[in-house]
Amino acid sequence: MGKIGIFGGTFDPPHYGHLLMANEVLDALQLSEIWFLPNRLPPHKQHEQVTKSEDRLRMLELAVAGHPRFHIETIELEREGPSYTYDTIRQLVAMHPNDEFYFIIGADMVEYLPHWHRIDELIELVTFVGVKRPGFSMETPYPVIEVEAPQFAVSSSLIRERVRNGQTIRYLVPEGVRLYIEEKGLYGARTGVTDRETTADRAALRAYAWRCRDRC
């Protein structure tokens, strides 16, 4: 019997924060594998513009390449309509009846569990794992395993914004992902811009160093 961690998301784009979070849960719970689950159409983002599935999948492949226990499950990309976790987990359980599934969520999602589609049935199929973050409560009426992880203040929206502004994203995403974004012109990228240290980057680094001078 395998212990499988499921990490769902749009991964638009995937970044080192995703990988760090997945690896911490893998180690803390001694899981067999982590399956990254790219969404086709997340219910909470139905009105947002999301990068094409094939681009997000390719970036995710580049991000997890080389980690022997990181894999990608494309079940939601292959299914039409909103990507409800209940439908996905029910299908995975049917396909892999001898495995145990652990669904990984950030602390910011824990308080929303009561609003998840068919949550009372879902908790009978999967164990939720919440990764702690400062400023977010882990209180919920549903069972959640809490996992500590180092804080890495990066988000997909931040990366998209930096690319649009012509700022570097080196060391925020795996190198293969950075090059793919540049090659495909995703998020408004222009060739060569994502790799150049700009005046804005240097100013941001100086500001960060100043804020952290007494506590970092």
Swiss-Prot record:
Family: Belongs to the NadD family.
CDD domains: NMNAT
UniProt record, GO biological process: NAD biosynthetic process
Keyword Methyltransferase part of the UniProt annotation: no
Pathway: Cofactor biosynthesis; NAD(+) biosynthesis; deamido-NAD(+) from nicotinate D-ribonucleotide: step 1/1
SUPFAM superfamilies hit by this protein: Nucleotidylyl transferase
Gene: nadD
Keywords of the record: ATP-binding, NAD, Nucleotide-binding, Nucleotidyltransferase, Pyridine nucleotide biosynthesis, Transferase
Catalytic activity: nicotinate beta-D-ribonucleotide + ATP + H(+) = deamido-NAD(+) + diphosphate
One protein family per Pfam: CTP_transf_like
GO MF, one annotated term: ATP binding
E.C. no: 2.7.7.18
Classification via InterPro entries: Cyt_trans-like (IPR004821), NadD/NMNAT (IPR005248), Rossmann-like_a/b/a_fold (IPR014729)
Keyword Chloroplast appears in the UniProt entry: no
Known function: Catalyzes the reversible adenylation of nicotinate mononucleotide (NaMN) to nicotinic acid adenine dinucleotide (NaAD).
Signal peptide per UniProt: none
Top-level taxon: Bacteria
Species lineage: Bacteria, Bacillati, Bacillota, Bacilli, Bacillales
Entry's transmembrane regions: none
Protein's name according to its UniProt entry: Probable nicotinate-nucleotide adenylyltransferase
